[in-house]
Amino acid sequence: MTVGSPAVVIGILLSTVIVAAWLIWVERRMIGIWQDRLGPNRVGPLGLGQVVADMVKIFFKEDWIPPFADKPVFVIAPAIVMVTMLLGFVVVPFAPGVGVIDFNFGLLYFFALSSLAVYSQVLAGYASNNKYSLLGSLRAAAQSISYEVFMGLAAMGVVMLAGSFNLREIVEAQKDGWYVLPQFAGFLAFLVAAVAECHRAPFDLPEAEQEITGGFHTEYSGMKFGMFFVGEYLGITLNSAILVTLFFGGWLGPAFLPPLAWFILKTLVFILFFILLRAALARPRYDQLMSFGWKVMLPLTLANIVVTGAVGLSVP
């Protein structure tokens, strides 16, 4: 296991938080363009200062805790999602020699951290002592547990081809070709599961405003609500980075750009895809989402593993 220098570690973690905050502006601006309207354009050039204005507004809002809530759990819950998402970035290989930690079970570490994030939503729904919050947290738990299975199975094809759980070795194994082509079914399954894991539209059923008034964060306001918000965008960035690492060669690309630039550009493409889904697709019913997972995603990912193993055994 190799650990980066303290300056690199601090720089990476701070950069991820700044990027997550900036993505709020990107999403609002892009959705405005796609919906033929301006989006935020009042604070700073092109509205770039809107994020700072929103942060100031949230900071000065009343930090209210419902009197019927379980106060210690209510306070801790928002921090869990931010901490787990930030810790997930420590195994992401951004470029050769650029990363926090390089160890052999980086992919398993990512799955472990992503599964812990749902505790934030479950505890928030429980501690709020609100029926809508509790229903949202139960939806979040069932959705995350189900789609974690499919995400893990989708990644197994890549592990079989690379022969390693080390994310840096998986990237280096793609020097002769990205895994998105031989693992296209696995890529599609991983992408769908990532959207469901992030609880992003159209799979934002745990917080569906039209159904359960905001779900698990119904009772939250101020900085605590902001932590949930930033945690969501950290999850989008983390899952986009893992998608790029597993299926699109990570930092690998033509020499006219440095490796870190290739990694950032590829990750940005998937972040914009996450945003586009919100603007383009309607939300399915909850039973349809769960049925799709177990009746379509599970057979697809299992078939992908079987085919990958069969091809690997037949080709010397």
Curated annotation (Swiss-Prot):
Molecular function GO terms recorded: NADH dehydrogenase activity; oxidoreductase activity, acting on NAD(P)H, quinone or similar compound as acceptor; quinone binding
Topology relative to the membrane: Multi-pass membrane protein
A family per Pfam: NADHdh
GO biological-process terms attached to the record: aerobic respiration
Keywords: Cell inner membrane, Cell membrane, Membrane, NAD, Quinone, Translocase, Transmembrane, Transmembrane helix, Ubiquinone
EC number of the protein: 7.1.1.-
Broad class of the protein's primary localization: membrane
Catalytic activity: a quinone + NADH + 5 H(+)(in) = a quinol + NAD(+) + 4 H(+)(out)
Compartment(s): Cell inner membrane
An example Gene Ontology CC term for this record: plasma membrane
Isomerase as UniProt keyword: no
First-tier enzyme category under EC: translocase
Transmembrane annotation, as ranges: 6-26, 74-94, 98-118, 145-165, 177-197, 233-253, 256-276, 296-316
InterPro entries in alphabetical order: NADH_UbQ_OxRdtase_su1/FPO, NADH_UbQ_OxRdtase_su1_CS
Cited function: NDH-1 shuttles electrons from NADH, via FMN and iron-sulfur (Fe-S) centers, to quinones in the respiratory chain. The immediate electron acceptor for the enzyme in this species is believed to be ubiquinone. Couples the redox reaction to proton translocation (for every two electrons transferred, four hydrogen ions are translocated across the cytoplasmic membrane), and thus conserves the redox energy in a proton gradient. This subunit may bind ubiquinone.
Quaternary assembly: NDH-1 is composed of 14 different subunits. Subunits NuoA, H, J, K, L, M, N constitute the membrane sector of the complex.
Family of this protein: Belongs to the complex I subunit 1 family.
UniProt-recorded name of the protein: NADH-quinone oxidoreductase subunit H
Provenance organism: Methylococcus capsulatus (strain ATCC 33009 / NCIMB 11132 / Bath)
Gene: nuoH
